[in-house]
Amino acid sequence: MAVKIKLQRLGKIRTPHYRVVVADARTKRDGKVIENIGIYEPKQDPSVIKIDSERAQYWLSVGAQPTESVAALLKVTGDWQKFKGIEGAEGTLRVAEEKPSKLDLFNQALSEANNGPTAEAITEKKKKAREEKEAKEAAEKAAAEKAAAAEAEASEEAPAEEAASEEA
């Protein structure tokens, strides 16, 4: 039985995803397979290529013939070079950068927001309560300023009185 390593197509019309499979050469593209040995997603940047190297080496050693596209994938991953004993067995596979975790993104957004929203939801009750609170705080602040001013005046007058009493 002639065995081939080929691509089995998955996905929607313009978003192809492939499985790298081992199947009889006479079966349809999406027909029955012997073993699934990897995946290939060409639309990602960089393309996602995950092939089980051990299984690919086994099937190549027992005589499975890769199609042209699978042979190109095996060269990128370095499996073809391992099989043939050629230098450059590490391949030229590009790996996508790791994305930050959602928890890290959340914590970063939380720190940027200074631990709270900048604007509150406003309803009539909340608006009145906020205005009353602001008025009360303003009155307290004004009273505190008056008390501080009176204290400052008293302290300014007291040394003058002491100086006058010393002169007399």
UniProtKB/Swiss-Prot annotation:
Show the GO MF annotations: structural constituent of ribosome
- Give Gene Ontology CC terms: cytoplasm; small ribosomal subunit
Question: What are the recorded Gene Ontology BP terms?
Answer: translation
Instruction: Show the segment(s) annotated as Disordered.
Output: 110-168
Q: Does the keyword Ribosomal protein apply?
A: yes
Taxonomically, the superkingdom here is Bacteria
Q: Which InterPro entries match?
A: Ribosomal_bS16, Ribosomal_bS16_dom_sf
- Family label: Belongs to the bacterial ribosomal protein bS16 family.
Name recorded for this polypeptide = Small ribosomal subunit protein bS16
Natural source organism: Corynebacterium efficiens (strain DSM 44549 / YS-314 / AJ 12310 / JCM 11189 / NBRC 100395)
Organismal lineage: Bacteria, Bacillati, Actinomycetota, Actinomycetes, Mycobacteriales
UniProt lists the gene as: rpsP
